[in-house]
Amino acid sequence: MKPDVGRLLEVAVGHLMGETVPMIGRAYEHSVYEQSNVGVLGMMLLAVRHEHERAAARRVEENQELRRMFARAGTVVGAGDVSERLVAAAEAEDTDLTVSALEESNAELRGLLIELHAAVEEIDSPEARTLEDEIWRELAESTRRRALPTLGDT
């Protein structure tokens, strides 16, 4: 048997919402609170299912985008420690595709993005403003990537 996490979560949500919530309503006179709790649990499991499905892909995509940005940013920032770390980060690759390793890499890259953003804000040039705009676009895109689906999207 090959465990299918997505299918397991679908079945669990179906049981909670289709069987458990109505059963609580029939079994207990004052059950609205517990029914709500089980309903929220079901919705959280749907979110987990969605995140499980996209977890590695989202992190790989974001890490690649950050590295592409860092490759272009070195010339804007100039020489120095941040520039050297940007080059090193841009040349690195994610070879371990486990979610925990990708998340660790992502956290390091996002930390470097914060440093880059701070450095770029101190530079007075059109290239720096263009890079700053790119940083803001990536931050917005990063938020979009993390968005959970609405109930109809699952």
Name each region found by the language model:
Residues 1-13:
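Disorder-to-helix initiation segments
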Residues 10-64:
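N-terminal interaction modules that seed assembly of large macromolecular complexes
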Residues 10-11, 30, 34, 63-154:
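C-terminal amphipathic alpha-helical interaction region
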